[in-house]
Amino acid sequence: MKAAVMGYGTIGSGVVEVLDINGSSIAKRVGEPVEIKYVLDLRDFPGDPIQDKIVHDYKTIAEDPEVKIVVETMGGVEPAYTFVKAMLEAGKHVTTSNKALVAEKGAELIALAKEKNVNFMFEASVGGGIPILSLIHISEPTRH
């Protein structure tokens, strides 16, 4: 399963790290490997292991049918709202730890997710990386 992370600060880099360190246990849980295909950020990260995954245009993620899960870790209402709304409209599951976004636009984004039959999840980011865990669990059918 392909995923994308929007924002590569403390929480975004933590999400990438959690998937890297715990990739095999997460794969067992969801029934397939979870791979970060893109990391959206304004900055470049020369020498960082994710440098080849950096994109600067959120539409690259929204328009890629392989990406099923998007983790928003940018913070603030804008541009997070515009980006998250585009992901939901594109039929992607989204999770965020962005309290400002959820407080101001949560009801609208929940309704859009329901309309598009995808999940919009929000939870506290206790230790960078936690926001992706529930989404992976919920977005995949139970494996026996």
Residue ranges and their predicted role:
Residues 86, 99-126, 133:
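Rossmann-fold NAD(P)-binding glycine/threonine-rich loop
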Residues 93-94:
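A short hydrophobic/small-residue beta-strand
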Residues 1-89:
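N-terminal glycine-/serine-/threonine-rich beta1-alpha1-beta2 phosphate-ribose binding loop
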Residues 134-144:
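Residue-level detector of conserved catalytic or cofactor/ligand-binding positions
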Residues 16-17, 50-51, 106-109, 131-135:
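Short acidic, glycine/serine/threonine-rich loops at helix termini
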Residues 13, 77-78, 103-104, 129-130:
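Loop/helix-junction capping segments adjacent to catalytic residues or to phosphate/diphosphate-binding pockets
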Residues 6, 72-74, 97, 104, ...:
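Structural motif
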Residues 20-24, 114-118, 139:
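Generic secondary-structure signature for well-ordered alpha-helical cores
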